[in-house]
Amino acid sequence: MHFKFNPLSTKYKSVTGGVKEHSSVRFYVESDEPVTMRMYSEDDYTDRAMKQTEGGFYLDFELSHGLYFYEFFSGGIKYGMGEDYRAVPTNKRWQLTVYPENYSTPDWIKGGIIYQIFPDRFCKAGDFTVGKGKKKREDWGGMPTFRSPDGKVRNNEFFGGNFKGIESKLDYVKELGVDAVYLNPICESYSSHRYDTGDYLKPDSVLGSIEDFKSLTKSGKERDIYFIFDGVFNHTGAGSRYFNKYFDYDEIGAYNDKNSKYFDWYTFWEHPESYASWWGFKTLPTIKKDSKSFQKFVCDKVVEYWVDAGIRGVRLDVVDELTDKFVYKIRKALKARGEDNFLIGEVWEDATNKISYGVRRKYYTDGLLDSVMNYPLRSAIIDYVMKGDCSLLRLTLLEQLNNYPKQSLDSLMNVLSTHDSTRIITLLGRRHTVTDKDLMANEFLDEWEYARGKEREKLATVLQFFLYGVPSVYYGDEEGLEGDLDPYNRRCFNWEKGDKDLTEHYKKIAKIRKGNAVFKDGVMNIIKAEGGLFVFTRGEGEQKITVALNAGRHTKQLYFSKAVKELYSNLTSDKFELKPNGFLIISAKA
């Protein structure tokens, strides 16, 4: 029996990827037998007979926003999604994401580049002082301490990176083609990572004043660089003015008195010592999911304060810990102060069908987020580069092409390293994995490992920069900064001895990305995915750009039917031969 369907081709599904609600989408199936299409919503399904046409059967749908799954029945056989998204006899269904009519994402970030900065470790300008219980480090570039001498993890040492330091390096950041700087938390806090917010309406004094921050955002805007604020709204610090466990603030906190105006924000089982905290960390008391006063404070005060200070986006930390209603309120508040303000969520899985705490999240079916951190793609790129097999990479790309709305796909935050992951050069270069954090401080790549890591990093960044979405470079990756898990992935930027060759590689791929409009929203097609050889295109016609990579162990010969122009490669001869870890970026010859 003949049966053919592929939702990633407009021949079979008139709109690829997510579909706008109430817009018509046509499904077409090649079949020599009558076909019934079954469409599942969250709690029901409908069967509809497809209409016969030349060569097969079709059916038009107009759906309200929501998450749907579908399959076909023909000739007594159930057809579902195969590994390549084509129809095969299986129980696995295709996903259909239907998003709201009024959903859109900011254009300014598409085709752009994000640069992530851990503020304490990027650049220091001038001296600084620290408060009670904090440790001042005078040795810029020294190894961060994991455990204090008493064995406790305090995260209380500061190297002094600050707003003025970042501002002094904006020209360098611009040379990397950067459009947006994502700053890890900058609010007043006890720790150097600042995920334990002390005061949402005050920058940390080590970083500088609010005037210093406004100067930074103003200088950034003059260079078309905009700043993304890290919104930590699931928990506060135990020492915050709102909880005030250590009596550091004059204000009465929830820990101090049940009559505190902040008492409603927190969950106490037995006041004051027994309370809900994030993953059991007593230094991070969690906010009640339904605290209306906290949500109003964030939307009316916090968002306004930082937008007025110059931010153009917010990244929501552990967004799956927040309710969809709260995320909607944050989005509404942020967009009310600028329709093109950018909202990113920290989601580690496919955000279009994410389930957390038993609830299906509606990040895209309700149009809540513009973007998420694309950890699934990170995993797939690393898997490809390390194993020399593109199977997972291909599957991940097909899945995201099918599941995400196009405007979301073009806005995904594509990461390789972050403050929560091992540095990419360390991950790709090392022979062995160290699991004991106390030993990671002594983990450095030897000469051979560094060379391998660097070569692989270049290969990985070609994918990161030229697939759909927006590449996000973690400060220091472009200069070969090493480091395993936290805190070793948060070392100081080396302004004296960085790897200039690697930095030049980043500048080259950034220039290609910024100089070709296809990387903003151009269609992506996989041309060849076989073993270690992966070839894809962006755009169509004369503007089309082809990217070829070889993560395998053997040299691959490439042939082109038309004259081409090489934009960048690491080829070692005039022939189009991709050696292991080779890459080639070409366009049609003018």
Predicted regions span which residues?
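C-terminal beta-strand-rich structural cap/linker in extracellular carbohydrate-active enzymes
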Residues: D574-A590
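Beta-strand-rich binding/interaction modules
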Residues: P34-D44, Y68-Y70, H554-L571
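Substrate-binding/active-site clefts of carbohydrate-active enzymes
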Residues: F118-D179, I186-A309, I330-R337, N353
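Conserved, mostly hydrophobic/aromatic
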Residues: I117, V173, L183, Y200, ...
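Active-site-proximal helices and loops of the catalytic beta/alpha 8
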Residues: T217-Y226, H235, S240-E251, V302-E304, ...
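Carbohydrate-binding surface patches
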Residues: S14-V19, S23-R26, D32-E33, I526-S561
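Aromatic/acidic polysaccharide-binding cleft in carbohydrate-active enzymes
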Residues: D120, G358, N414-L445, T461-D499
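The feature marks proteins involved in alpha-glucan
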Residues: M1-Y28, D43-Q116, F122-F146
